[in-house]
């Protein structure tokens, strides 16, 4: 059995097991991963809501229209074949160019705010660290070791 995390995507694979074992283990892994993905998306929205603005002094969040925060979602685990499932959390829907600038830092250009440096938010990195730790702990709780 293996669970891999890469770029906001969780991949679960079970090899060399009987069909019954695969089904039972995959059901448990699917449930654990779906919980982690859902919690991870909520964490991402919280990070946006609690990371001070890079543009407005004294503003305690990065919410203007709410679109960037609302775009943080999760895709539940989907079966790719009998022994493999994939799911994701983060900006899984429409991604605007400014999301990347908020995430990684860089120059903001626009008529409303003018050109200003945006400090990075690092939401995706923070999400990954939290979700990875949560996933490992929940799998240890379910399967041991």
Report residues per predicted region.
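Short, Lys/Arg-rich flexible segments
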Residues: 1-88, 99, 103-145
């Amino acid at each position: 059995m293996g669970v891999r995390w890469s770029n906001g995507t969780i991949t679960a694979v079970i090899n060399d097991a009987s069909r019954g074992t695969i089904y039972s283990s995959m059901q448990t892994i699917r449930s654990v991963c779906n919980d982690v993905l859902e919690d991870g998306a909520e964490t991402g929205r919280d990070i946006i809501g609690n990371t001070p603005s890079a543009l407005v002094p004294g503003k305690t969040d990065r919410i203007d229209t709410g679109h960037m925060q609302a775009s943080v979602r999760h895709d539940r685990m989907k079966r790719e074949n009998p022994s493999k499932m994939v799911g994701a959390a983060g900006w899984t829907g429409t991604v605007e160019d400014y999301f990347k600038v908020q995430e990684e830092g860089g120059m903001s250009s626009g008529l409303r705010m003018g050109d200003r440096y945006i400090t990075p938010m690092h939401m995706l990195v923070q999400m990954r660290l939290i979700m990875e730790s949560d996933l490992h702990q929940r799998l240890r709780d379910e399967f041991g070791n």
